[in-house]
Amino acid sequence: MSSALSLTPSAVSAPTRLRLPDLLHTTDRFADDVLRGRFTRLLPPGGFPADSRWFARLHSDDELDVWLINWKPGLSTELHDHGGSLGALTVISGELREQRWDGHRMRSRRLAAGDQAAFPLGWVHDVAGDALSVHAYSPPLTAMSYYAVTADQRLRRTRTELTDASAGG
């Protein structure tokens, strides 16, 4: 059995009643709440760390997790999926660079302040940048797999990690 995968984003139904447009609306609403100061109490007292990604959970229930993430230049998430969860993000400030696997090769896009992105099941990407963003996952993340692209342009899963409820996605 080969460990190389040929994953493509698909319209596979998710184990949640929420859909991608719902998650985009959620990240937009929470981004507005962050800008209005609703979550100031969650921000680090001395400002965001200079050398690491920072995150805080803004909301959690049985079908939805919402995170605020501060990204630092030079740090990336590595190429990963979101297990059995759908995802979405809204960039509040700065810019994120997303490298995603389209089933055949890597594609790149930049997301600036105000931009949104949605992640269906099977979405494999790497995110980096210097930004503040809100992310929503439904159902809440329980596992993430990490990948490498092989010389023959296939995905190879390198590891799968269970997510820690306290460690943002």
Residue ranges and their predicted role:
Residues 67-82, 111, 120-122:
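Conserved short histidine dyad/triad with adjacent acidic residue
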Residues 73, 84-99:
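Glycine- and acidic-residue-biased ligand/ion/polar-headgroup-sensing regions
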Residues 130-169:
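Double-stranded beta-helix
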Residues 60, 81-83, 90, 129:
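Conserved strand-loop elements at the edges of beta-sheets that form or border functional pockets
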Residues 88, 100-129, 159:
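Short acidic-glycine-tyrosine-enriched beta hairpin
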Residues 44-73:
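A short glycine-rich, His/Asp/Glu-containing loop-to-beta-strand
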Residues 78-80, 98-99, 124-130, 135:
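Short beta-strand His + acidic residue motifs that chelate non-heme Fe in jelly-roll/DSBH
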Residues 1-43:
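N-terminal leader/capping segments at the start of a protein or of a new domain
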